[in-house]
């Protein structure tokens, strides 16, 4: 599942696209940029593909944002044998898992800080995702395990 959000900094908006594994809740791909566009979504997708090496025909769900509907993004999906799925119009519940992640990110990090520059926000978001959220943060839906700990118990 993939989606985008924005974080306001002293230099303007910094956009973040994330790819979430719905089963383990792990953020497997992400990218940040001052521009919310197809190259940003493609960067997050490529990171996810590199980390996961998904099986052909895996479904990647997103909302109907223009960056996810772009020909360039769809071409990269096709190159990796992935199938696109998009939310029903006006139905935020289709993206509930990643909207929950955005809520956690914002309430646990963003709303408590004022980021003067992009680099400051990038560093904090990187640490939140890679050090805290994926490795440490417990999820009730995962029997109170972190995403990485939950995945390690599967193998």
Task: Give the role of each language-model region.
Residues 1-155:
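Charged DNA-binding/catalytic regions of mobile-element recombinases
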């Amino acid at each position: 599942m993939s989606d985008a959000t924005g974080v306001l900094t002293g230099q303007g908006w910094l956009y973040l696209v994330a790819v979430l594994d719905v089963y383990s809740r792990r953020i497997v791909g992400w990218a940040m940029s001052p521009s919310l566009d197809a190259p940003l979504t493609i960067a997050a997708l490529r990171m996810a593909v590199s980390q996961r090496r998904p099986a052909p025909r895996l479904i990647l769900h997103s909302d109907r944002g223009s960056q996810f509907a772009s020909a360039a993004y769809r071409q990269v999906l096709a190159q990796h044998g992935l199938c696109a799925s998009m939310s029903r119009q006006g139905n935020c519940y289709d993206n509930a898992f990643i909207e929950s992640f955005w809520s956690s990110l914002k309430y646990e990090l963003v709303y408590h800080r004022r980021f003067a520059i992009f680099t400051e926000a990038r560093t904090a978001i990187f640490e939140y995702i890679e050090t805290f959220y994926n490795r440490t943060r417990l999820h009730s839906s995962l029997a109170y395990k972190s995403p990485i700990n939950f995945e390690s118990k599967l193998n």
